[in-house]
A protein has these predicted regions:
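N-terminal polyanion-binding entry modules of DNA glycosylases/AP lyases
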Residues: 2-4, 13-144, 206-240
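Catalytic DNA-binding helix-loop module of base-excision-repair DNA glycosylases/AP lyases
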Residues: 71, 145-191
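A general secondary-structure boundary signal
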Residues: 84, 151-154, 201
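Alpha-helix capping at helix-to-loop junctions
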Residues: 89, 93, 128-135, 155-158, ...
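C-terminal end-helix/capping segment
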Residues: 182-209, 240
Length: 240
């Protein structure tokens, strides 16, 4: 099971640029999502505090998105970005190291980027699958449902549901994905609801049914709730 950190994985794409969130259904967008979530007793105050939804997918091929998501598994966002920067430096002529380049790199070079042995194995498997033509392109992925992509991509080494959910939200712009295994999402809900403990993933999934068809936006606001609490803790000593 993969879990994110306390906040949305920055390198995957948090949509801070204020661009429109891509959707797969006409009429589902930022204004509709905000209005729907504002009616929730728990999320409503978060929406009011955070303001407009700024979730925007980054146009990447699933290969790149999955490698980036692997980097972000169970580490702080800054650490993941440092590892990815070292990986990019190994293929300076490309925007992102192509599968063939990754497969040609010795394991020591990938370990030198900071990736664990498990992450190196996962990245190599993703690259090999892409090089063989068995990883769907962005265009092909757009024709598959969320469930189909989760079933297909979790067959890859090291790729769990959370990893695919990050691709669905931040690369494909799917509007109704709630990553209940994500620490930041559950922590955001705990804070917003005033709970002593985080909800269990299955309980949050049940709670989140009321947020459909805007569960990706709900996740974004829950990440922001966790961010705001983290920021408040950092600023508290300075205010004393």
């Amino acid at each position: 099971m993969q879990r994110g950190g306390a906040t949305a994985p920055a390198g995957i794409g948090t949509g801070e640029g204020g661009q429109r969130m891509a959707t797969t259904k006409p009429g589902i967008g930022r204004a509709a999502a905000r209005a729907h979530l504002s009616a929730c007793p728990v999320l409503g105050p978060v929406v009011a505090q955070v303001g407009p939804l700024r979730l925007s997918p980054v146009r990447r091929e699933p290969y790149e998105a999955l490698v980036r998501a692997i980097a972000h598994q169970q580490v702080h966002g800054r650490a993941a970005e440092a590892m990815l920067a070292r990986l990019l430096a190994l293929a300076p002529a490309a925007d992102f190291p192509p599968p063939a380049r990754v497969l040609a790199l010795p394991e020591a070079a990938l370990r030198g980027c900071g990736f664990s042995a498990a992450k190196v194995a996962a990245i190599r498997d993703i690259a090999a699958t892409a090089e063989a033509g068995h990883l769907p392109s962005r265009r092909a992925a757009a024709r598959l449902s969320d469930a189909e992509l989760i079933a297909r991509l979790t067959a890859l080494r090291g790729v769990g549901r959370w990893t695919v959910e990050m691709l669905l939200i931040f690369t494909l712009g799917r509007p109704d994905v709630l990553p209940v295994d994500d620490f930041g999402v559950r922590e955001g809900y705990r804070l917003a609801a005033g709970l002593d403990a985080q909800p269990k993933p299955r309980d949050l999934a049940t709670i989140g049914e009321a947020w459909a068809p805007h569960r990706s936006a709900a996740a974004w606001y829950l990440w922001r709730a966790a961010d705001l609490a983290k920021q408040a803790r950092r600023e508290a000593p300075a205010a004393m």
